[in-house]
Regions:
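Catalytic PLP-binding core of fold-type I/II PLP enzymes
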Residues: 1-19
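Conserved active-site segment immediately N-terminal to the catalytic lysine
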Residues: 4, 18-29, 38
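Active-site C-terminal subdomain of aminotransferase-like
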Residues: 28-110, 124, 193-195
């Protein structure tokens, strides 16, 4: 069996054992760099010419491997920014430090959601993400009011995914703990005003 993972949302948020995967891919735009750059980590035994007919050249990893990842013009600026982020994370203490920071941020938000009488998290505890925290009020009109009022106080892009609705706090590596605390304080105020 081969495990393939899309780690676009959580790559570099905590240490991972890459040996447990056949292939990891991640758009870097959430935790590493600008949109348009992708990281692929693939197990060597999966780098072969044996691909399905019609597979686009960009997905034929043997071509990339044989050309030292330079088969086409690389996104130089994106790679440059990613390199800066890698150095920054290393300087901070690496992924163990990021994991602790991200767990601390997520705990603040999940603890509030677990105690709130208005807001409810939508993911069971054992499956909760450190990066994306979806929640609802249970009332679409109230969700819309929350989103509108949040925008007025500088909380942007809190609307949930279009297929799920509600709200979603994306607390990626770059989000400081102060940002999460600010969100929770706003949520408490909103809850008090909308009992």
């Amino acid at each position: 069996k081969i495990l393939v993972a899309d780690m676009s949302s959580d790559i570099l948020s905590q240490p991972i054992d890459v040996t447990q995967y056949g292939l990891i891919f991640a758009g870097v735009q959430k935790n590493i760099g600008p949109a348009g750059t992708v990281i692929v980590i693939i197990r060597e035994d999966l780098i072969t010419d044996d691909v399905l007919n019609g597979t686009p050249t960009m997905l034929k990893y043997k071509i990339h491997s044989d050309n030292n990842s330079l088969y086409n013009t690389p996104p130089a600026y994106g790679i440059y920014i990613c390199g800066k982020v890698f150095k920054y994370l290393k300087k901070l203490g690496g992924l163990e430090v990021m994991k602790v920071r991200n767990e601390e941020k997520a705990k603040i938000l999940y603890d509030y959601l677990d105690s709130s009488k208005l807001f409810n998290g939508t993911v069971v505890k054992e499956d909760r993400s450190l990066m994306n925290v979806p929640f609802i009020t249970g009332n679409k009109e109230l969700d819309d009011k929350f989103i509108k009022e949040a925008k007025k106080v500088g909380i942007e892009n809190i609307r949930g995914h279009r297929t799920v609705g509600g709200m979603r706090a994306s607390i990626y590596n770059a989000m400081p703990i102060e940002g999460v605390k600010y969100l929770v304080e706003f949520m408490k105020k909103f809850e008090e005003e909308n009992k």
